[in-house]
């Protein structure tokens, strides 16, 4: 039985990024190997994660994992971990009993994204604008997706320490004359405008409808994919403005997070939305909003911003941690279960 202070995990290690619709897994056979991608699992196809792993993965592979490290979108407060946007409840004790695992660690999904930005490969990121990375300096990752995820990564005592939080729910307010025209038409949450009300998939639609309402025109599009596609092709003025404003507002919030963490190591934009609208993020609006932080605009110009283009960034972060857990200050108390 490992001691309570032991930070190592027994190989093979199953790593998993569990979202609202899809759960993606990979297998690390040993510390020197690259993760082997496993078939993705749709959460709606299985009643429990145990069923999904047994029938969707374990029955199809010859190597049996001894440990599991999972990233989930949901609060980790007890032996039962409900997922925010899916019907599963993760019960690590059941995983130990039913799947023959020896060790299960569950962390926040954006902790995994933060782990991935400690040492990203050049081909996994695209720089937006100027600035340069200061080694071993704090970093921030933001991810517009189902919601707006935010996490920091701080280097202290020769260790990268992920700092999860709820930064996506910070206040966001109007600054320009155009903002003040649009803001009354935005759908708030409990009387206030949080970043996540705009900077996520449904937030794109919230912003698009507000732009249309401010101009007295009827919305043409019904979902955010139509809005972003039309904007990038230059077909519809309201869609173009929506994505331009989205990039601007994302730049403002990203700049705020950079100031909070003094993120001289860089600010990273993760997730599918950032990848899809990358052409818009590469235009001046995002970076101008990011740098517009008087009295610290000169400082902001030195902080680099990147889009993460790795297709499985969270799994990449989990793999880095699984190989060398002592290189990272991941809190395990109350989040690790062993047989």
Curated annotation (Swiss-Prot):
Binding site for ATP: 16-21
Keywords: ATP-binding, Cytoplasm, Glycolysis, Kinase, Nucleotide-binding, Transferase
Gene3D superfamilies in the cross-refs: 3.30.420.40, 3.40.367.20
Subcellular location: Cytoplasm
Residue intervals passing through the bilayer: none
A single Gene Ontology CC term: cytosol
GO MF: ATP binding; D-glucose binding; glucokinase activity
Pfam family name, one: Glucokinase
Top EC class, one word: transferase
InterPro entries: ATPase_NBD, Bacterial_glucokinase, Glucokinase
EC number, as in UniProt: 2.7.1.2
Gene Ontology process terms (BP): glycolytic process
Catalyzed reactions per annotation: D-glucose + ATP = D-glucose 6-phosphate + ADP + H(+)
Coiled-coil intervals: none
Family stated for the protein in its record: Belongs to the bacterial glucokinase family.
Alphabetized NCBIfam families for the sequence: glk, PRK00292.1-4
Stated name of the protein: Glucokinase
Species this chain originates from: Sinorhizobium fredii (strain NBRC 101917 / NGR234)
Upper lineage: Bacteria, Pseudomonadati, Pseudomonadota, Alphaproteobacteria, Hyphomicrobiales
């Amino acid at each position: 039985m490992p001691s309570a202070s032991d930070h190592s995990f027994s190989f093979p290690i199953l790593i998993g990024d569990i979202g609202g619709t899809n759960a993606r897994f990979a297998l690390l056979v040993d510390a020197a190997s690259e993760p082997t991608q496993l078939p993705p699992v749709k959460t709606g196809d299985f009643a429990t994660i145990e069923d999904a792993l047994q029938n969707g993965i374990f029955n199809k592979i010859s190597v049996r994992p001894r440990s599991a490290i999972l990233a989930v979108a949901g609060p980790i407060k007890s032996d039962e971990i409900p997922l925010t946007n899916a019907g599963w409840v993760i019960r690590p004790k059941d995983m130990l009993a039913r799947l023959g695992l020896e060790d299960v660690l569950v962390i926040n999904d954006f902790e995994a994204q933060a782990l991935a930005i400690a040492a990203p490969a050049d081909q996994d990121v695209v720089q937006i604008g100027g600035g340069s990375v200061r080694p071993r300096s704090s970093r921030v990752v933001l991810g517009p997706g189902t919601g707006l995820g935010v996490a920091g990564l701080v280097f202290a005592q020769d260790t990268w320490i992920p700092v999860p939080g709820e930064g996506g729910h910070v206040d966001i307010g109007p600054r320009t004359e155009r903002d003040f025209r649009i803001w009354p038409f935005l759908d708030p949450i409990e009387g206030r405008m949080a970043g996540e009300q705009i900077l996520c998939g449904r937030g794109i639609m919230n912003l698009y409808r507000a732009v249309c309402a401010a101009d007295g025109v009827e919305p043409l599009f019904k979902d955010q994919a139509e809005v972003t596609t039309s904007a990038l092709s230059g077909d519809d003025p309201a869609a173009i403005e929506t994505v331009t404003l989205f990039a601007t507002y994302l730049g403002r919030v990203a700049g705020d997070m950079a100031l909070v963490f003094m993120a001289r190591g860089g600010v990273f934009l993760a997730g599918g939305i950032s990848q899809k609208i990358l052409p818009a993020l590469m235009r001046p609006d995002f970076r101008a909003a990011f740098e517009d932080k008087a009295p610290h605009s000169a400082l902001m110009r030195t902080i680099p911003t990147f889009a993460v283009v790795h297709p499985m960034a969270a799994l990449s972060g989990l793999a880095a941690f699984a190989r060398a857990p002592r290189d990272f200050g991941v809190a395990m108390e109350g989040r690790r279960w062993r047989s």
